From Swiss-Prot:
Function: Component of the 90S pre-ribosome involved in the maturation of rRNAs. Required for early cleavages of the pre-RNAs in the 40S ribosomal subunit maturation pathway.
Species of provenance: Neosartorya fischeri (strain ATCC 1020 / DSM 3700 / CBS 544.65 / FGSC A1164 / JCM 1740 / NRRL 181 / WB 181)
Biased composition regions of type Acidic residues, renumbered to the chain: 57-84
Full protein name: rRNA biogenesis protein rrp36
Family, per entry: Belongs to the RRP36 family.
Length: 356
């Protein structure tokens, strides 16, 4: 209990009273052992005086051996008593005191280095008790604490507990006098309608995007008109070819957009008509247009929107297109590409002849 009290108080390792008690006990034990040895020596001397010379020498040797055994027994008893006292005192130490002592000692590497330094300086490893080690470690911890408190805190840089923790900054750091009164405008970013949330927000409907970007059709028409005017004014053949190519691609694009718009109008009218029939009870199931029927209705709507002259020209172009398609599907014998006597075969080298 003495050692635990001292560790908890953090003043001393062992009080002076216990040391005096231990010293008195050891002294009394040594005196009693000396008296026993003296008594045994007197007995041996009496017995040896009565015998002859040979017996005297044997008795003397026996006495010396007995004295050595007694001394060894005394040393063993003293060491056992000391170890028992230390173990009893250590068993009464509280866990809190042990934890404080261990925290104040520092890492094991420092302990080992200090132990090696002590052994190298002395040249011999003295058999120190665990209490002496605890006392030395407590002294070292106090010295380290005293040295750490003496250092100035300004030299220590603020460090974070981990890399994810926020940065620590002193409150004495002066604040800058510069203030942002007016924030500069943000840099303009290009907007792509394919990925614009304003366009894609309405559940992916293309009608919203078309209505929002309907002005692009006007731009395309104006661009096509401008290219046609340039083509009429230019005389460079290369520039003319480039303008013709651009005009052709622009007209194809406008034609495709117009055809898609007609298809959507035809589908919307058909769905509306079918819904009205179902509502009136004339139909139970709606009729869905096939691609061929949709194509016919779109073509009919296209011709209805044209004028008389445009309609005639469009029909003539369509007729030429159909005849060319039929001629391609016709076999080679019926196309008039060779004489009847020399029929056309894959291995022959006859030339093709155009029909007038």
């Amino acid at each position: 209990m003495a050692v635990s009290d001292l560790l908890n108080r953090r003043v001393r390792a062992v009080p002076d009273e216990d040391e005096e008690v231990y010293s008195e006990a050891s002294a009394s034990e040594s005196e009693s052992n000396d008296e026993e040895v003296e008594g045994s020596g007197s007995d041996i001397s009496v017995d040896s005086s009565e015998g002859d010379y040979g017996s005297e020498s044997q008795d003397e040797s026996d006495a010396m051996s007995n004295e050595n055994e007694v001394e060894d027994d005394e040393d063993d008893e003293n060491s056992d008593d000391g170890q028992d006292d230390v173990q009893a005192s250590l068993s009464n130490i509280s866990f809190g005191a042990l934890a404080k002592a261990q925290a104040s000692l520092g890492p094991k590497a420092k302990r080992k280095s200090k132990a090696t330094e002590s052994t190298t300086d002395d040249g011999e490893t003295p058999a120190a008790s665990p209490l002496d080690d605890i006392r030395a470690r407590i002294r070292e911890a106090r010295e380290q604490k005293r040295q750490g408190s003496s250092k100035s805190k300004d030299l220590e840089k603020p460090s974070r507990s981990s890399k994810h923790a926020p940065m620590v900054q002193s409150s004495k750091h002066p604040v800058t006098r510069k203030r942002t009164i007016i924030e500069p405008p943000a840099a303009l970013k290009s907007r792509d309608p394919r990925f614009d949330p304003a366009v894609r927000s309405q559940s992916g409907r293309s009608e919203a995007s078309q209505s929002a970007y309907a002005f692009l059709d006007d731009y395309r028409a104006a661009e096509l008109k401008e290219m046609k005017e340039k083509l009429a004014k230019t005389k460079d053949p290369r520039q003319k070819e480039a303008l013709k190519r651009d005009i052709r691609s622009a007209t194809d694009r406008l034609r495709t957009i117009e055809n898609r718009r007609r298809e959507k109008e035809v589908l919307a009218e058909h769905k509306k008509r079918e819904k009205e029939l179902i509502r009136d009870g004339k139909k139970s199931n709606p009729y869905f247009l096939k691609k061929s029927d949709l194509k016919k209705q779109v073509l009919l709507k296209k011709y209805e929107s044209m004028g008389s002259r445009q309609r005639v020209k469009a029909l003539e172009r369509r007729q030429k297109k159909l005849t060319a398609k039929e001629r391609k599907e016709m076999p080679m014998e019926r196309r008039g590409l060779g004489n009847d006597s020399t029929p056309y075969n894959d291995g022959g080298g006859g030339k093709r002849r155009r029909l007038a």
